[in-house]
Structures are given as structure tokens and as C-alpha cells.
A protein has these predicted regions:
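Bacterial N-terminal signal peptides that target proteins for export
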Residues: 1-2
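Flexible, glycine/charged-enriched surface loops at secondary-structure junctions
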Residues: 184, 232, 287-293, 329
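N-terminal signal peptide c-region/cleavage motif recognized by signal peptidases
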Residues: 10-12
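N-terminal catalytic scaffold of extracellular/periplasmic and nuclease hydrolases
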Residues: 16-244, 251, 266, 315-319
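Generic, well-ordered alpha-helical scaffold segments in large soluble proteins
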Residues: 278-282, 321-328
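Secondary-structure transition/capping motifs at alpha-helix termini
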Residues: 16, 285-287, 325-329
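Accessory "access/gating" subregions that flank catalytic or transport cores
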Residues: 249, 259-288, 299-300
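Active-site His/acidic residue clusters
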Residues: 152-159, 253-264, 288-289, 293-326
Length: 329
């Protein structure tokens, strides 16, 4: 996996030494070839993507403690924590060894990856993330993605666990006051938006066969903590910018991820730019500033599937989100 990352901060604040607001954009799987092809696809050879107009560009070498080819978990964790770790691990230290989850057979049919096998002690320690450090400074926080909210890239901002596939435990780390909550999030993340997945809903053999065997409804728990829950474009547009938001969008029905841009129904499912704009509107209410992570998560999925057109369209959608953000900061 190759990732190109753009971090946006007000240039005035940069000159002063510390940014009030930070928007961290991550195009998952989006390497130089994909960027070049997307530019030509949208604007022609002489055109420019919005991301290409930014004043600074850098390249990185990606490898982990145990592999030359990394996955999204240790790479995003490196961005968020500054720590080089092992493949599959999320925002833990170099002493952490990945231990995959196993199926929960207490229900029929069984639910894969529902049992977290990470030892409670003796397998490394968590490392603070940029999002957590921003919360500690009194800033608002947000996570927006076109992938599942519990997928490796978004999870690295708010969760600490020895294996990225333990998504049932990753989800509960985001729910304030509940069992398994990550206390470094204080009262919780202000904005959460991404593809829906069963990791947030209770198990039901007929309706949510991949739901939570522990029976918890994490969306209901978040609503009890003051979050507004939305699931389509209309409810997102109607949501107040004065409160907290959990958006889980299920139109794609594709492993919990949102639709590819080419397949998205613009009347029902929000674009990444629309989600980014809404997140900024909400987070901007905090006078101390905010930290927002925005992932174009399906670029990588299209490239894995050797589907060039979908990859290019999702890269352009990601670039549109950057343009939308620049229009608001």
C-alpha cells in the first residue's frame, strides 16, 4: 500500500508556531501514478488537482518493524503517533505483537473476528495519537471516511489494539462511558462519519448476522450521550451544527464501506466533500480549534480490484473534499 497524505493548517498559524485547526487528509492507496492519472482523467495533461496547488510536497518511505510492505494499520499509526510498529497493529508501541481475533461461536451462525485476543497486559502499550492530543488541548475532534469507521485508517486515530481486524472492540473504544471506551478521548469524538457496519449494532441472525454478539447497540448508546445519528444525505443536511454527530451510511452494502463515487446515488448518499463540509461546520464551533481526519478510503479498494476508473473517480472525489475544506478555512 502507498499512501499520499496532505495535512492542512492555516499558514498564519504555521508562521506563529502552532496551528489552531488541523485537517489531515489521507488518500488511501493514492500514490503518484494514481494522482497523475486522475489529473489527466479530470483536467487533462496541463491541468491541476487542488492538492497539487498546495505549497509543500513530501515523499516518504513506508516500511514497518516486521515487513517491507506495510498495511494501513501501522502506516496510519505512524502518522498519528510517530511510532514505527508492526503490521496489523493500531497505535501501540514497538513492543506490541499482532494477535488476530477469532470467531464468536456463542451465536448461530458464528460471528467472525468478534473475540479480541489481544492480551490485557504484557503486549506493549498505547501511544497517544494526534487526535487524542488535540482533545487534551480542549480542541474539537472529527473522523470522516468513505470506508468503515472501524477500518484501519480511521481506527488509528482513536483506538489502540494489537490487531486491526478486532473491529468489534475498536468500535466500542469510541463510545463514551461504555465498556471498553478509550479514556484518552475524554467525553468522546465530536464527529464520526463513514460506512455503516454491523460492528455498531447488536447481533440478529436475520437482520444483522455480523452484528455484535455482546448485544450492545453502540449507535443508541451514542445517542444517549447527545449524538445525532444520521444515515443518508437528507438527515445529514438536516442535522444541527451545534451538537455531536454519528453518521453511518449504508447505501453501498459493500462490507460496510460507502459506495464508490461512480456508484454513489447523489440524492441519498453524501459525497466525501459534503461530509467534510458538515464536519468543519460542527467542529468550528469550538473556540479552541479542532483536529479533523478525512480519508478517501475507497481509492485503495478500487486499486486492489484493478478497477482503474473507480480509483480515479474516488481520487477526484477526495480532491474535491480538499477543495471544499480550503473554501472554509
Amino acid at each position: 500500500m502507498v499512501a499520499t497524505t496532505l495535512a492542512l493548517a492555516a499558514l498564519q498559524a504555521l508562521a506563529a508556531g502552532e496551528a489552531k485547526n488541523v485537517i489531515f487528509f489521507l488518500g488511501d492507496g493514492m500514490g503518484p501514478v494514481t494522482v497523475t492519472a486522475s489529473r489527466i482523467y479530470k483536467y487533462g495533461e496541463a491541468g491541476q488537482l487542488t492538492m497539487e496547488t498546495l505549497p509543500r510536497t513530501a515523499r516518504i518511505r513506508t516500511y514497518t518493524l516486521d515487513a517491507q510492505t506495510p498495511d494501513s494499520a501501522p502506516t496510519m499509526s505512524a502518522y498519528m503517533t510517530g511510532a514505527k510498529i508492526r503490521n496489523e497493529v493500531l497505535s501501540m508501541d514497538a513492543n506490541t505483537v499482532a494477535k488476530p481475533p477469532s470467531a464468536d461461536t456463542s451465536v448461530t451462525p458464528s460471528v467472525g473476528n468478534a473475540i479480541n485476543n489481544c492480551p490485557a497486559t504484557g503486549n506493549g502499550a498505547s501511544v497517544p495519537t494526534l487526535l487524542e492530543q488535540s482533545i487534551a488541548k480542549g480542541k474539537a475532534s472529527g473522523v470522516v471516511t468513505t470506508a468503515r469507521l472501524t477500518h484501519a485508517t480511521p481506527a488509528a486515530t482513536y483506538a489502540h489494539i494489537c490487531h486491526r481486524d478486532a473491529e468489534y472492540d475498536i468500535a466500542r473504544q469510541a463510545v463514551p462511558g461504555g465498556a471498553g471506551f478509550n479514556p484518552a478521548l475524554d467525553t468522546g469524538i465530536d464527529v464520526l462519519m463513514g460506512g455503516i457496519s454491523s460492528y455498531w449494532r447488536p447481533y440478529n441472525a436475520a437482520v444483522t448476522p455480523r452484528g455484535r454478539p455482546d448485544g450492545r447497540d453502540l449507535v443508541t448508546e451514542l445517542q444517549a450521550k447527545g449524538y445525532t445519528a444520521v444515515n443518508d444525505l437528507a438527515s445529514l443536511n438536516a442535522a444541527s451544527v451545534s451538537g455531536r454527530l454519528i453518521g453511518l451510511f449504508d447505501q453501498a452494502l459493500a462490507q460496510g464501506h460507502m459506495s464508490y463515487e461512480l456508484d454513489r446515488d447523489p440524492a441519498k448518499e453524501p459525497s466525501l466533500a459534503q461530509m467534510t463540509s458538515k464536519a468543519i461546520d460542527i467542529l468550528s464551533k469550538n473556540p479552541n480549534g479542532y483536529f479533523l481526519m478525512v480519508e478517501g478510503g475507497r481509492i485503495d479498494h478500487a486499486l486492489h480490484g484493478t478497477n482503474a476508473k473507480r480509483a480515479l473517480a474516488d481520487t477526484i472525489s477526495f480532491d474535491d473534499a480538499i477543495k471544499a475544506a480550503l473554501g472554509k478555512v
